[in-house]
């Protein structure tokens, strides 16, 4: 018999996370590594677990995720988004709680591009009056 699997895709900045939720005891595996090995900071680990803790499903599902692109913070945000979307497929009644917490909303803030004539996105070259 095939195992029940729920899929979700999360994005944040340049990071994309493909998340699978499988009934289990709460193990989180990211790119074939444990969450403690993958994220060095507890704040990032907590950020990934937030949707599961909010819906009280942390001990019901194992999370298997593949994430690439971006930095650690972007990847953690992408995982949070992907887990929330997968939880929604598992149980549609979780939508109000996840929506209220803002976990279903894609954070659209992106890095602003560098403009010509400037040192960065907005930083202008030093100005000398004389």
From Swiss-Prot:
<keyword id="KW-0687">Ribonucleoprotein</keyword>
<feature type="compositionally biased region" description="Basic residues">
    <location>
        <begin position="111"/>
        <end position="130"/>
    </location>
</feature>
<dbReference type="GO" id="GO:0022627">
    <property type="term" value="C:cytosolic small ribosomal subunit"/>
</dbReference>
<dbReference type="GO" id="GO:0006412">
    <property type="term" value="P:translation"/>
</dbReference>
<dbReference type="InterPro" id="IPR023035">
    <property type="entry name" value="Ribosomal_uS9_bac/plastid"/>
</dbReference>
<dbReference type="InterPro" id="IPR020574">
    <property type="entry name" value="Ribosomal_uS9_CS"/>
</dbReference>
<feature type="region of interest" description="Disordered">
    <location>
        <begin position="109"/>
        <end position="130"/>
    </location>
</feature>
<dbReference type="InterPro" id="IPR000754">
    <property type="entry name" value="Ribosomal_uS9"/>
</dbReference>
<protein>
    <recommendedName>
        <fullName>Small ribosomal subunit protein uS9</fullName>
    </recommendedName>
</protein>
<comment type="similarity">
    <text>Belongs to the universal ribosomal protein uS9 family.</text>
</comment>
<keyword id="KW-0689">Ribosomal protein</keyword>
<dbReference type="GO" id="GO:0003723">
    <property type="term" value="F:RNA binding"/>
</dbReference>
<dbReference type="GO" id="GO:0003735">
    <property type="term" value="F:structural constituent of ribosome"/>
</dbReference>
<dbReference type="InterPro" id="IPR014721">
    <property type="entry name" value="Ribsml_uS5_D2-typ_fold_subgr"/>
</dbReference>
<dbReference type="InterPro" id="IPR020568">
    <property type="entry name" value="Ribosomal_Su5_D2-typ_SF"/>
</dbReference>
<dbReference type="Pfam" id="PF00380">
    <property type="entry name" value="Ribosomal_S9"/>
</dbReference>
């Amino acid at each position: 018999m095939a195992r029940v699997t729920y899929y979700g895709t999360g994005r944040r900045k340049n990071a994309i996370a493909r998340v699978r939720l499988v009934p289990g005891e709460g193990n989180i595996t990211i790119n074939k590594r444990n969450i403690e090995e993958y994220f060095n900071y507890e704040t990032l680990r907590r950020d990934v677990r937030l949707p599961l803790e909010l819906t009280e499903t942390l001990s019901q599902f194992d999370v298997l995720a593949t994430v690439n692109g971006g930095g650690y913070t972007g990847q953690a945000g992408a995982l949070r988004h992907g887990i929330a979307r997968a939880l929604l497929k598992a149980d549609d009644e979780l939508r109000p709680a996840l929506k209220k917490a803002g976990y279903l909303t894609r954070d659209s803030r992106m890095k602003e591009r560098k403009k010509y004539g400037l040192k960065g996105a907005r930083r202008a070259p030093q100005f000398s009056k004389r």
